[in-house]
């Protein structure tokens, strides 16, 4: 679908008004922005957003026999060991496919004969 909207159309439609932004936390992976806003109903408030700084890529490797290869590791935020698909963050300028190839090789030692994009989402 082609986007024929003028460059400023979102500004005209946005019912939120931002009166200030601060960054209470930032590291190599994410930034937290805290915005002072006026809600669409006119009430003031604070709206905080976590912005992911790097493209994240996951690979679900399925071999010729139908086996799925997962990697296991201790996840500090979960407080437990977790089995998961090979995944990681792209280096600056690295595209998703190159990142997927690199992460698969780094985490499993495997190389895929083919890749199929299944999902892309904004977090």
Residue locations for each model-derived region?
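A short coil-to-beta-strand element that immediately follows conserved catalytic motifs
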Residues: 17, 111-118
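Acidic pyrophosphate-coordinating catalytic loop
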Residues: 23-27, 76, 121-123
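Short helix-to-loop capping/linker segments positioned immediately adjacent to catalytic or ligand/cofactor-binding
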Residues: 107, 118-123
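Acidic, metal-coordinating catalytic segment for phosphate/diphosphate chemistry
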Residues: 20-58, 63-64
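Conserved Nudix-box catalytic region and its N-terminal flanking loop in Nudix hydrolases
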Residues: 2-4, 8, 13-15, 50-53, ...
């Amino acid at each position: 679908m082609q986007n024929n909207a003028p460059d400023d159309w979102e500004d005209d439609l946005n019912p939120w008004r931002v009166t200030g932004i601060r960054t209470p936390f930032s590291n190599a992976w994410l930034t937290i922005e805290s915005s002072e806003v006026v809600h669409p109903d006119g009430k003031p408030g604070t709206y905080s957003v976590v912005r992911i700084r790097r493209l994240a890529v996951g690979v679900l490797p399925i071999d010729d026999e139908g086996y799925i290869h997962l990697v296991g590791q201790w996840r500090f935020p979960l407080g437990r060991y977790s089995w998961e698909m090979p995944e990681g963050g792209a280096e600056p300028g690295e595209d998703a496919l190159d990142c997927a190839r690199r992460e698969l090789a780094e985490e499993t030692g495997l190389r895929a004969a083919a890749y199929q994009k299944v999902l892309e989402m904004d977090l």
